[in-house]
Amino acid sequence: GLGDVYKRQVPLIVDNTFATPINCRPFEWGADIVVHSTTKYMDGHAGAIGGAIVDSGSFDWTKHPDKYPGLCTPDESYHGVTYTERFGLAGAYITKATVQLMRDLGAIQSPQSAYYLNLGLESLHVRMKRHCENAQRVAEFLQQHENVSWVQYCGLPGDKYYELGQKYLPHGSCGVVSFGVKGGRAAAEAVMGRLKIASIETHVADSHTCCLHPASTTHRQMNAEELLAAGVREDLIRYSCGLEDAEDLIADLDQALQ
């Protein structure tokens, strides 16, 4: 829990890509730093690759200078500045992340990509509501389908994360549903091949519905034992609901599962 994090004297960093700030605000639950892949819902249209780091400025790095020498001792590669002294707790981490990532990796968006991202952010609150509504309906449909062996979506009562979802994500989680197809790997691959609306891709969290069979794509080099250890079942399909009409998505899934 959160207490264990602080006992170990480390900041709590939360990846809020799927929930977005619309559905979850980690700082209100004790997080110190939040990260996002803005390529996903924030952009929403697969138009611009990007990421974001948001620092609450709440973690006291100076209490544990031995653990964080990069923030608490002079940085000889940047004019000998000590970030905690120069920028305080509110600016030490994010300043170091900004200046060093830009300098060493060129981690800054082009003006055109930033423009696309800003356009996406304008409609984020509208899109997230639709993504969540579609995912809830799709998950409920899959839960009742005779050819589906299991469904994981925290909006479903009975899901092992349902109570946590209600606590941290009261307005919905995201549009991504995971489910298993009866018949294992071969059956899951067959379902993927019959889908007509969803595109098969590793991308996720987009305005267009997309899906993935990890065992035969991203994790295809693993054997059955390694897949299980990685938490990837051979019957698993990851289905990312877009903004299409839920009835169309359900009809497409229904015909693919027959």
Where in this protein do the model-derived segments appear?
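Short, surface-exposed connector motifs at secondary-structure boundaries
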Residues: 7-10, 123
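PLP-dependent enzyme catalytic core of the Aspartate aminotransferase-like
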Residues: 127, 186, 193-194, 209-258
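Active-site C-terminal subdomain of aminotransferase-like
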Residues: 33-36, 42-176, 180-210
